[in-house]
């Protein structure tokens, strides 16, 4: 059976870099993701004075529980949301003056709930242009800790940032969450903090994080489940079979739950200890599914929805409107370009069955739009992309890996460029 080697998880790599930088000692990360986002995170750590050593398969980070080594720094976060949200939080635990900026795309993405919570904890933080957006400056003097209330209804990354900060504060944190999206990503954070020596307690909607810092370790990064979704969907939509090694029972990432959606649609799914296999059965059923907890895979499902035998309705995904682009509108626009009937609302999209026609996909610079509609291209020769290279954000080698899988199945692909 074809097996695809999926690069390391972006979300796990970003958290691991934060934890390694904050830990006491030298941490080795095994098989981290090397992409524009994670390289930007590592570059940001270096700008703050952390030492990050790299070999082809590992990164070593010299931790500094006391915070950044440099008293002043300017950090450019590129397009990375984790970089733009986690690094200012890490810097706040230190002592110095730190300025953060990001790409135009990232400047448009919201930050206000996190920066409001940091200010409530006493952090001297100032937005230099639009309130709640980059660029921003932090005059760091450590964080005392205590109680704080957070709205994480737009992004679970706000909560993750505060959870990661907790052990670096003097008193620990008690975080009351009023709303939470993509909850499985928070479970990733808590599990990884445990690997670095910190146990988070949850009391309903309150998360209690002790002070005391992190201890260095060797940490293996599992394959990216969001990236794997394109290959699983490819098998389901073509009636073929694919296995992703290293992503099986016990995986941290909630986005592996996408295979349960494929199972509901009629695909055969086998989750073993050491990997996951999806087999297409030649047909896909329509369905209605809430994807709030696995919303990064919403475009994957939208891209294969026309091939289902009935309508596909995806609900509870309002947060996808504030990603790299408005993904609900981007999916709808591109499906219409392909001749597919689509309806959308504030937090939903409904896609009717149809036969997509060749067209150029408008990517909006969003890696997930490209990778999702590449799956559509397996059944629709002639699909192309206005910016195929934006996949470098999470999987620089995507087109080659996807083309190799398709060739192994005997399916010719239109060149992406």
Summary of predicted features, one role per range:
Residues 1-417:
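Short, structured segments at the rim of ligand-binding sites
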């Amino acid at each position: 059976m074809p097996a695809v080697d999926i690069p390391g998880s972006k979300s796990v790599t970003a958290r691991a870099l934060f934890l390694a930088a904050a830990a006491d000692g030298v941490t080795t990360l095994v098989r981290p993701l090397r992409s524009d986002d994670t390289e930007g995170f590592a570059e940001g750590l270096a700008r703050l004075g952390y030492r990050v050593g790299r070999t082809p398969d590992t990164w070593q980070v010299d931790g500094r529980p006391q915070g950044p080594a440099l008293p002043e720094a300017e950090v450019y976060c590129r397009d990375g949301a984790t970089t733009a949200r986690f690094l200012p939080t890490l810097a706040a635990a230190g002592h110095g003056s730190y300025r953060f900026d990001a790409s135009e795309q990232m400047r448009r993405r919201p930050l206000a709930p996190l920066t409001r919570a940091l200010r409530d904890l006493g952090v001297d933080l100032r937005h230099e242009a639009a309130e709640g957006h980059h660029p921003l400056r932090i005059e760091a003097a450590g964080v005392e800790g205590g109680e704080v209330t957070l709205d994480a209804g737009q992004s679970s990354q706000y909560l993750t940032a505060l959870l990661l900060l907790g052990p670096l504060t003097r008193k620990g944190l008690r975080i009351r969450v009023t709303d939470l999206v993509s909850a499985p990503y928070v479970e990733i954070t808590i599990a990884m903090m445990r690997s670095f020596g910190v146990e988070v307690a949850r009391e309903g909607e309150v998360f209690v994080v002790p002070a005391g810092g992190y201890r260095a370790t060797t940490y293996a990064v599992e394959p990216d489940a969001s990236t794997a979704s394109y290959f699983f969907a490819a098998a389901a939509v073509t009636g073929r079979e694919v296995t992703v090694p290293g992503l099986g029972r016990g995986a941290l990432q909630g986005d592996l739950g996408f295979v349960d959606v494929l199972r509901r649609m009629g695909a055969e799914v086998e989750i073993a200890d050491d990997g996951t296999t999806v087999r297409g059965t030649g047909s896909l059923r329509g369905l209605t599914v809430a994807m709030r907890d696995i919303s990064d895979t919403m475009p994957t499902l939208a891209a294969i929805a026309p091939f289902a035998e009935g309508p596909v309705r995806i609900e509870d995904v309002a947060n996808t409107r504030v990603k790299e682009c408005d993904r609900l509108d981007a999916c709808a626009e591109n499906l219409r370009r392909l001749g597919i009937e689509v309806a959308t609302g504030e937090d939903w999209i409904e896609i009717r069955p149809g036969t997509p026609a060749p067209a150029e996909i408008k990517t909006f610079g969003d890696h997930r739009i490209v990778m999702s509609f590449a799956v559509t291209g397996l059944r629709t020769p002639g699909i192309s992309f206005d910016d195929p290279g934006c996949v470098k954000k999470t999987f620089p080698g995507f087109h080659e890996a996807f083309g190799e899988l398709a060739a192994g199945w005997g399916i010719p692909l239109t060149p992406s460029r």
